[in-house]
């Protein structure tokens, strides 16, 4: 299922153009996680690899990008939406 919407302009720009100064330190990992999310047939697909550390908090799902950053999204009938890369700490 394709990503339905983004709640962060920088995350959307990285996904659509491959460019983002804000996420330059971990750009390739973030792009890989976004591509995986875009292709995911279900939220459970994001459990692999185990390093993704998929967790649900307050109605949103979180996938680990690195020690500081997470790919956060909600999952509906049409797939992932409100996708953003954030520092939850």
Task: Label every model-predicted segment.
Residues 52-89:
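Enriched for short, Lys/Arg-rich terminal
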Residues 1-33:
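Arg/Lys-rich, positively charged N-terminal/basic patches that mediate binding to nucleic acids
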Residues 20, 39-40, 57-58:
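Short secondary-structure boundary micro-motifs
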Residues 2, 19, 42, 50-53, ...:
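Glycine-rich, flexible loop/turn motifs
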Residues 4-5, 13, 47, 59-65:
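Alpha-helical interaction segments
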Residues 25-52:
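Compact soluble domain cores
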């Amino acid at each position: 299922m394709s990503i339905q919407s983004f709640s962060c302009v920088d995350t959307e720009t990285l996904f659509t153009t491959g460019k983002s100064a804000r996420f330059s330190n971990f750009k390739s990992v973030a792009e890989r996680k976004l591509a995986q999310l875009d292709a995911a047939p279900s939220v459970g697909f994001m459990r692999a690899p185990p390093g993704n550390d998929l967790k649900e908090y307050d109605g949103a799902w979180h996938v680990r990008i690195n020690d500081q950053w997470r790919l956060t999204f909600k999952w509906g009938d049409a797939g992932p939406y409100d996708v953003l890369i954030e520092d939850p700490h």
